[in-house]
Amino acid sequence: MVDALERFRKILGADWVFTGDKVASYRDPYTIPNDAERFQARAAVAPASTEEVQAIVKVANEYRVPLWTVSRGKNFAYGGAAPVLSGSVVLDLSRMNRILEVNEKFGYALVEPGVSYFDLYRYIQERGLKLWLDVPDPGWGSVVGNALDHGVGYTPYGDHFGMQCGMEVVLANGEVVRTGMGAMPNNNTWQLFKYGFGPYVDGIFSQSNFGIVTKMGIWLMSEPAGYRPYLITFPREEDIEQVVEIVRPLRLNNVLQNAATIRSLVLDAALFTTKSQFYPHAGPIPDSVAKQIMADQEIGMWNFCGALYGPPAITDVLWTATRDAFASIPGVKFYFPEDRKRRPDILIHRADTMKGIPKLTEFGFLNWNGGGGHVGFSPVSPITGQDAIKQWRMVSGRVREHGFDYMGLMAVGFRELHHVTVIVYDQNDPQERQKLDELFRLLVREAAAEGYGEYRTHINYMDTIAGTYGWNDSSLMKMHETIKDALDPNGILSPGKSGIWPRHLRAGRKS
């Protein structure tokens, strides 16, 4: 490793090779459980170009040095910049932060991995371009990294990987490939048409360790002729069944235009308040306190945030259909921003997010009960009321049994619900971290037993989640391993990412 680090310094300069105390920022910000030896980087390197990435990869191959790639390292609740395999060198792409092109006519951007949502938003605003981003909740993350990890947002362009078009990838041998139309010299549709000619390979570079994405095209939304965000609140937890049954036909028929979310009481309240304001005790809040929070914050046990996009002639019709569909639920309330007088307010916050304005407001929930740690449990289900209430009962029951408040949302996709439960815990309390670990593993087992799979997870659980996708004697993982061995025979790229290990590290792996 010493010789490899010296070679890295010759490539990048000593200022961009980090060792010793300088590696501290590449640790998991929320270590789970209490084990200081896990997920520890030996060093980190920060290239500034594709050519420098190529050179680093070639040296890593020569010395068999494992590289853990991060775009900006802001994937908090999923491990941050920490590697699965301790002793890895973090390949930090945050210096590769060029916005190479933003095309207003065709609605796309071509960016490097270090470009954040704040960066791209600022670029568009400074130039007065009539384009909107789609952003996840924390805007400090990488546009490329979030798409590769199957992140989601809240406009009609909410499927971030679905909106990527054309990649540049450095393979494990240092070779550079461009996918789709980018494989043709002098082609001018690289960011316009995904597929090119032959197999579509972009997908194998998402949530994987088969290559290092150094450029990506991302589609941007043209600024609509009108925008109307709204909030619909529901007074009972059991309402989630009827709410989701109403949502499905509205979504399938594009009456609901965006990736709307159905958010729980505590998740929304926690953005702007703390638990101690209502219940200065340990354990989950009782029903009486939940009702107090509802009245104080003017929200429901479930809160549906959505938006309408387009000229009034269109949005008026869509709103009438939406309002009439939900009006059948007893106690339902409808709001537009002008109806919300208190500040700060959940609809005012979400109104920005649903028009692509990056923020960090969502991190407010970390102050709910102190300690600042959180992890996301994210099983996927069909858009049915039966599945929604089944998942809610299963997850919220276990969360409360373990002494935590249920903080969840159901994000409405094109055909599916992402049920994202945020478990907030005291990262400084070893017992609470252990309790969190036990809860998470129980949730994974019980969800898998019901056929619900997670779509992303913390590095601590990648092997565990990968193991739940075991149909036909784990034939999918066997295919992943075959691809891994072919593209990365020395196993240097992000060992253990998504449970995919190189041949020499596979034996004896357990979740």
Task: For each feature predicted by the language model, list its residue ranges.
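C-terminal cap/substrate-recognition region of VAO/PCMH-type FAD-linked oxidoreductases
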Residues: 201, 217-218, 228-239, 243-354
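Conserved oxyanion/phosphate-binding beta-strand-loop segments in alpha/beta enzyme cores
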Residues: 7-31
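FAD-binding subdomain of flavoenzyme oxidoreductases
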Residues: 98-102, 111-253, 511
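Long, structured ligand/cofactor-binding scaffold of large enzymes
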Residues: 29-130, 141-152
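Short beta-strand-to-loop capping motifs
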Residues: 48, 232-238, 306-314, 378-385, ...
